[in-house]
């Protein structure tokens, strides 16, 4: 039989669009780049952790930063999605013990050098918070598809867990 090459695109998630304005001189770090060691969180100063998802990623970095962190969440409780795993109350206990400031029901509107502007989700009242950087823990989206691929799986379709990506990759390979 054949033996021709078949390309399956499996990777490619990138940071999604930001729901806030950011000046060119503002320090905005993508959590994926921080975790990969591509960029580093400044060693000193307040860090705003923007967590529009309410999952473990924003909670984990805020917990690590401790009292330096200001966790901005649109939800009524930090890490709202952790309720499904049973870690909601323990995570909030850890955040409190670490000294993390939590800005609940808060939307991030703009990032400037040295400050962010936030808005109360319900009242619309805006105010500023001083910080040296923002770590964006927002949504990921797939990259543009490659030309002439037989299939797209994993992060090429939408962000996945490692388990989901490996499973989809194996299924795609088995179907070739």
Residue ranges and their predicted role:
Residues 1, 96-108:
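A conserved beta-strand/loop element that lines the FAD pocket in flavoprotein oxidoreductases
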Residues 1, 10-83, 119-176:
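Rossmann-like dinucleotide/flavin-binding elements
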Residues 20-24, 92-99:
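Short, conserved catalytic or adaptor-binding loops enriched in Gly and charged residues
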Residues 83-90:
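Alpha-helical protein-protein interaction modules
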Residues 110-111, 152:
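Generic beta-strand structural signal
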Residues 113-116:
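Short, hydrophobic/aromatic-rich segments at coil-to-beta transitions
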């Amino acid at each position: 039989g054949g033996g021709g090459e078949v390309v399956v695109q499996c990777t490619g998630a990138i940071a999604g669009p930001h729901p806030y304005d950011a000046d060119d001189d503002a320090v905005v770090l993508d959590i994926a780049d921080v975790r990969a060691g591509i960029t580093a969180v400044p060693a000193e100063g307040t860090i705003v952790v923007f967590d529009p998802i309410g999952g473990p990623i924003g909670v984990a970095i805020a917990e690590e930063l401790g009292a330096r962190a200001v966790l901005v969440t649109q939800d009524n409780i930090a890490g709202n999605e952790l309720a499904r795993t049973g870690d909601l109350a323990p995570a909030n206990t850890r955040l409190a013990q670490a000294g993390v400031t939590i800005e609940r029901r808060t939307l991030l509107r703009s990032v400037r050098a040295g400050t962010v502007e936030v808005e109360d989700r319900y009242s619309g009242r805006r105010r500023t918070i001083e910080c040296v950087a923002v770590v964006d823990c927002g949504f990921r989206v797939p990259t543009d598809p490659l030309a002439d691929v037989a299939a797209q799986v994993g992060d090429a379709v939408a962000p996945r867990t490692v388990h989901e990506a490996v499973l989809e990759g194996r299924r795609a390979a088995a179907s070739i």
